[in-house]
């Protein structure tokens, strides 16, 4: 009788441990998927910004032809940022720093471009430019929100 109770107690302990380990594993998988999803949202917003840049550069070219160096800086920063990608299943601190650095350079180039464009009142009156600028500002806000969400999840 005593052996029978011991066997049942051992079986119960093993079952409890099994379900606890399974629950921990499922929680880890769920968190990992959450991190991947949050990162993909960050990437989506960065891609949206990169998609707006060619239209912005083309609009500005006609008005600020002699600002070639600034425009080339934006185009080159965009190209560099496009080359730098991260595999969501292999997020490392080093790869995140490299990605953020490339995106930061692009953001700086866009900021310089916007400062230069303050000198062109005709451009500021262009409806297409104003819409692109508003979309770019909205995208920058979305990037900030998605990065915050990613940091909360990660």
Placement of each model-derived feature along the sequence:
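A helix-centric hydrophobic-segment signal that preferentially recognizes long
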Residues: 1-154
